[in-house]
Structures are given as structure tokens and as C-alpha cells.
Amino acid sequence: MKLSRRGLLAGCASMMLATCRRREPPPAPAAAPRTVDLFIESDGDFLAFTPDTLMCPTGAIVRLTFHHGGKFLSARHNWVLVRPGQMEAVDKSVEHEEGLVSKDDPRVIAFTPMCDKGASVMIQFAAPGPGDYPFFCSTPGHGECMNGILRVINDL
């Protein structure tokens, strides 16, 4: 088979055009979740958290440090974050002699272990969707006074 000069040029031109066509840039990598550091402590030897309201953006990785600010009383404290409307039910369901929260409870978003006075602990969790999420101390009798709100907003 004999190729004409015109056919050869047409074939070369089409190959060049095929390699020169516009290519879409690769998709941008997904942004890593934002990390937010929050600090909360028990208010000395009182049954209260300071602050009693925390704020973070939805989807953020939250690194929460809880400090037991007590100096004299030996009561242990923790921090338990639950779904809206679930604080009382979760508080009633904990093992009340120790105030321990079940890690398998779907109503619980995050919690710290119990801390003795002067101790600190850091936990990490993904912020839930927008809304107000209650938190409390699950030591028996503390939840009524020792509670607050994590306000999750679309963006800070």
C-alpha cells in the first residue's frame, strides 16, 4: 500500500492535535479538616465548668483539654459531650458508683476519663453538625450543676 504525501501529512497532523489537546488539571486535593484546640476546667472546688460555653466549626478536629481545677476536695470530674436532648438520659445510664460512661453509647459523642484534682487530660474528636450540644460531668450528682454547651457553627 502506497501512502500519499497528503495522507501522511494528515495522519501526522491528527496525531499532533491529539497530543496537544487541552488537558484538565488534576482535581485539587481535599482540604484537611481544621484543628481547633479548646480548654475547659472544673472551677476550683465548685461544681461548675469554666467556661460553660465552648464554640467550634462543624467538621473540625477538636482537641479538648480538660483540667480538674480542684485543690482541696477529692471529688473526681470528667467531661461528657452528648447529642442534644440526651444529657439527662445519659447521666441516668452511667455506672453511678464511678460515673463511668459507656464508649458504645450512641448518644455520647466524646468524653474524658475521670480526673483527680490537679490532673489534665486531652481528647480528640470530630465536631458534629451545627447545633448546641450539651456537656456535663458524670460523677454522681454533679451533672445538674456541672454542665454547659458546645456550640457548633458552620464557620468561625
Predicted regions and their residues:
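N-terminal export signals
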Residues: 7-22
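Extracytoplasmic/periplasmic copper-protein system
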Residues: 20-43, 85-101, 126, 140-156
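N-terminal edge beta-strand
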Residues: 33-59
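Short, solvent-exposed loop/turn elements at domain surfaces
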Residues: 45-50, 72-77, 88-90
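Short beta-strand and strand-turn-strand segments in soluble, beta-rich domains
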Residues: 46, 99-109
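Asparagine-centered strand-capping/turn motif at beta-strand->loop junctions
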Residues: 66-68
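Extracellular/periplasmic metallocenter environments
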Residues: 71, 106-156
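Beta-strand signatures of extracellular beta-sandwich domains
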Residues: 78-82
